Amino acid sequence: MPKGEGKVIAQNKKARHDYFIEETYEAGLVLQGTEIKSIRNGRVNLKDSFAKVEKGEVFLHNMHISPYEQGNRYNHDPLRTRKLLLHRREINKLIGYTKEQGYTLVPLKLYIKNGFAKVELGVAKGKKKYDKREDMKRKEAQREIERAFRERQKI
C-alpha cells in the first residue's frame, strides 16, 4: 500500500511468517450493509482466511466479520464467502500463479481507502519449517547487532 493511503483495520501477521510473499494486489470487497459498519469498528479477523479463483472470479473464504451490534435481523453470516473485485488482467495472472505448484492467495491486510474497504492480497508460497527457523535466527542476529550498536553509542 503506497504512502498516505487508507486506515489499516486488520493485518494477517501470521501470513508473512508462514509464507513467502511473491506479489501483492489491491482488491475491493463486495459487502452487505452491516458488514462495512463492523469493519469500520475494527471487528475483523483475517487469521485463517484465503482466496480462491472460481469460474473466473476471486472469492475470499473464512474472513470473519463480527455481526454489527445494532444490526438486528439485517445482520450477515460472519464467515460467508465474499467476492473480490479485481481487473481481468489481474485475475488472469492470479489464475496462472495458482495453477503452479504450491502457490496460494492470502489476504495480508484489510484497510479503508477513500471510504471503500480494500484487501491487500498476496500471492504466496508456503515456508518449510527450516525456512521459519532461518528467519528467526536472522531476526535474532539483527537484534543482537542493534543492541551492540546502541551500547557503543552510549559510551
UniProtKB/Swiss-Prot annotation:
GO BP of this protein: trans-translation
Localisation per UniProt entry: Cytoplasm
Pfam families, sorted: SmpB
GO molecular function: RNA binding
PROSITE patterns registered for this protein in UniProt: SSRP
GO cellular component: cytosol
Protein biosynthesis found in the keyword field: no
Keywords: Cytoplasm, RNA-binding
Function in brief: Required for rescue of stalled ribosomes mediated by trans-translation. Binds to transfer-messenger RNA (tmRNA), required for stable association of tmRNA with ribosomes. tmRNA and SmpB together mimic tRNA shape, replacing the anticodon stem-loop with SmpB. tmRNA is encoded by the ssrA gene; the 2 termini fold to resemble tRNA(Ala) and it encodes a 'tag peptide', a short internal open reading frame. During trans-translation Ala-aminoacylated tmRNA acts like a tRNA, entering the A-site of stalled ribosomes, displacing the stalled mRNA.
Family as reported in the entry's similarity comment: Belongs to the SmpB family.
Protein name as catalogued: SsrA-binding protein
Organism of this sequence: Geobacillus thermodenitrificans (strain NG80-2)
